[in-house]
UniProtKB/Swiss-Prot annotation:
This is Deleted in lung and esophageal cancer protein 1 homolog. Coiled coil: none annotated. InterPro entries: DLEC1, Ig-like_fold. Keywords: Cytoplasm, Differentiation, Spermatogenesis, Tumor suppressor. Interacts with alpha-and beta-tubulin. Interacts with BBS2, BBS4, BBS5, MKKS, TCP1, CCT2, CCT3, CCT4, CCT5 and CCT7. Expressed in germ cells of the testis (at protein level). Also expressed in the lung and kidney.
């Protein structure tokens, strides 16, 4: 039975292989039937024949179908890491990833997997628990190493920062000692050795400063003293040169001293001889010229050498008499050329013919601005206004110029448009600049533009923005009159704009000025500051138009009330308005009573709070007597 079952298994395996071969042959397109078999088909044929042979001899212990399904898929290779762009970097991870590939780049147990394994521990398997303990210890050691590396990196960075600060302080102190600061001083001694902890570096097997410093460390640092810098000390060759020069100077001084002594001796002998001869022959002494008293200049310089030195001095002096560049001098000056708009002043006739013309450097400008003042008017918030300013060269030489833009953010200067290349303006030609004005309110703005040339004088072009302000015909004091306490009185005032521009106005209490935001203060319709209220609080008036301002007076106390309101215009101008009102109580005067005033009889009952007493005469029943009272309002 066993042999029959084995034969049946071999037959089923061979039939399965043949069926797979048939499917592979059928899957080949019709156009490739005449060609040879593909490499995959031949490989499958070879593997199938080997499997059939193996199955024939009975080597496999599992079924063929189970063997095919048990093969695991090959893992995808890990991607290589990029090579660092810098050649000085010490990172070699890309080399390790290229050599070891999956062993280096593939993550066997990541952080997420290890965290989940440690959190879910509690298995009955002892080997699994031991593995988790070792994994937790490895993670703790790994975290400790990372913390130590971060601590070392932080310590090195702090030491480097302290070293840089100490170096800068030492360099600054050395610059104070040098009279003439050179372009770049030599570096000072570094203090990095004293800022780094050598024991900590050795503990973690790192290179410390003591490994490359051979001099012994002093027990305590030496006191700092003012010492001459190495850059200010003389070198060996310079010292030798100065020593040789000092010796030559000493020899020259000794030689001059000897010549002076000889000259003095000869002068005394000659003077005595000349005095004796003068007494004998007075007429001959007048004709003969006396010898020079100081012969030192004759001993040092010969006549040919003296002439050569004079020619050398004359040639050196002639080098300074060159033609000056007229661009560096104002016009109508000795070296500045002529002005095209300001003529030279002629000398007076009475003066000599050699009189020089009067030069003036203040009346002759180099560039003339057209227009001379940048003026903007009738502007609004939002648009950008432009103006072209032309600068004309008024001299007889071509000149360069530099225009400095305005300093305020409301004016901007565009690029210059020159008549030629290179930014040079020929005589009589003009260059143009566009000035932009960007207002953020309707107020007044002032700024200026500076035009600099190679001459020392600077041209100032003012920039102004003016808008005719609106003018309101509103009295500075608004009197609401008298009102009873607890009542309401409305007073109307006419407000007219007699200016030349449209204005938007906002009324607010004085305590709210200046506001953080006009949107928060400007209420629609009504603004209140007890006991007064003004409406409307926001309005707009065109030139020649008027509006009625209603002032509400609600007195709560007796006497005069006064409050101040601020009227703010959109051109940043304000106007203070004082609102005045008087609160009163009810006051009545009894002027006349028909029949006259009566007095109560003694003992007769009456109202003690009453001021007047009115008595009616006895009348019949159902009759109606009348008395007329005249009452006047005394408020």
């Amino acid at each position: 039975m066993d042999s029959e079952s084995k034969e049946e298994q071999q037959c089923t395996a061979s039939s399965a292989v043949m069926s797979s071969l048939e499917t592979q042959f059928l899957s080949v397109p019709h156009q490739l039937e005449s060609a040879s078999l593909s490499w995959s088909i031949r490989k499958s044929l070879h593997s199938s024949t080997v499997l059939m042979d193996d199955c024939h001899f009975g080597f496999p212990t599992r079924s063929l179908r189970a063997g095919f399904h048990a093969l695991p898929p090959l893992p995808e290779p890990q991607t290589l890491r990029l090579r660092p762009a810098s050649l000085r970097t010490q990172e070699i991870s890309h080399l390790l990833a290229r050599v070891f590939r999956n062993l280096y780049t593939a993550q066997v147990i990541g952080d997420d997997l290890s965290d989940s394994l440690i959190k879910a521990r509690g298995s009955e398997d002892a080997r699994h628990e031991e593995f988790l303990d070792q994994l937790q210890q490895a993670r703790a050691i790994y975290k400790q190493r990372l913390d130590e590396a971060a601590m070392l990196e932080r310590h090195i960075m702090q030491a480097r920062a302290r070293d840089i600060a100490e170096t800068e302080h030492t360099t600054k102190q050395s610059r104070l000692q040098v009279v003439e600061t050179p372009v770049k001083l030599p570096p000072v001694k570094t203090a990095f050795r004293w800022c780094l902890d050598s024991k900590l570096m050795r503990k973690h097997h790192l290179i410390s400063t003591e490994d490359y410093y051979t001099d012994p460390v002093p027990f305590c640092p030496a006191p700092k003293d003012k010492s001459t810098l190495g850059c200010s000390k003389l070198t060996f060759s310079c010292e030798q040169r100065f020593l040789r020069k000092s010796e030559l100077d000493r020899e020259a001084e000794e030689h001059c001293r000897q010549l002076t002594e000889c000259d003095d001796f000869e002068y005394t002998v000659d003077s005595l001889g000349s005095i004796s001869k003068a007494k004998e022959r007075t007429t001959d002494s007048v004709k003969k010229t006396s010898r020079p008293k100081n012969k030192k200049w004759m001993e040092h310089l010969q006549v040919p050498q003296r002439a050569l030195d004079r020619r050398l001095l004359a040639s050196m002096e002639n080098r300074n008499h060159f033609l000056k560049n007229p661009r560096f001098f104002p016009p109508n000056t000795p070296h500045g050329g002529k002005s095209l708009i300001v003529p030279l002043s002629k000398p007076e006739r009475r003066a000599s013919l050699n009189a020089e013309p009067e030069w003036s450097c203040t009346d002759a400008p180099v560039f003339l601005a057209k227009p001379s003042v940048g003026f903007f008017t009738d502007y609004e918030i939002g648009p950008v206004y432009e103006m072209v300013i032309a600068l004309q060269n008024t001299t007889s030489t071509s000149r360069f110029l530099r225009v400095l833009p305005p300093s305020s953010p409301y004016f901007a200067l565009g690029l210059g448009m020159f008549p030629g290349k290179g930014g040079i303006v020929a005589p009589g030609m003009t260059c143009q600049y566009i000035v932009q004005f960007i207002p953020d309110c309707l107020g007044d703005f002032d700024d200026f533009i500076l035009v600099e040339t190679q001459s020392p004088h600077t041209l100032v072009i003012p920039l102004q923005a003016r808008r005719p302000p609106p003018v309101l015909t509103l009295s500075p004091v608004l009197d609401c009159g008298h009102c009873l306490i607890g009542g309401v009185k409305i007073t109307k005032f006419i407000c007219k704009n007699v200016g030349f521009s449209v204005g938007k106005f906002c009324i607010m209490p004085q305590k709210s000025w200046p506001p953080p935001s006009f949107r928060a203060v400007a209420t629609t319709g009504f603004v209140e500051q007890p006991p007064f209220g003004v409406m409307p609080s926001v309005f707009e008036l065109a030139p020649g138009y008027a509006i009625l301002l209603e002032v509400l007076f609600l007195p709560t106390g007796l006497g005069q009330a006064e409050e101040t309101f601020i009227i703010v215009c959109d051109n940043c101008q304000i106007k203070e308005v004082v609102v005045v009102g008087t609160g009163q109580l009810v006051a009545l005067d009894l002027i006349h009573i028909s029949g006259g005033k009566n007095e109560p009889d003694p003992g007769e009952l009456k109202d003690l709070t009453a001021q007047y007493f009115i008595r009616f005469e006895p009348e019949n029943v159902q009759s109606t007597p009348k008395k007329q009272l005249i009452i006047r309002n005394a408020t």
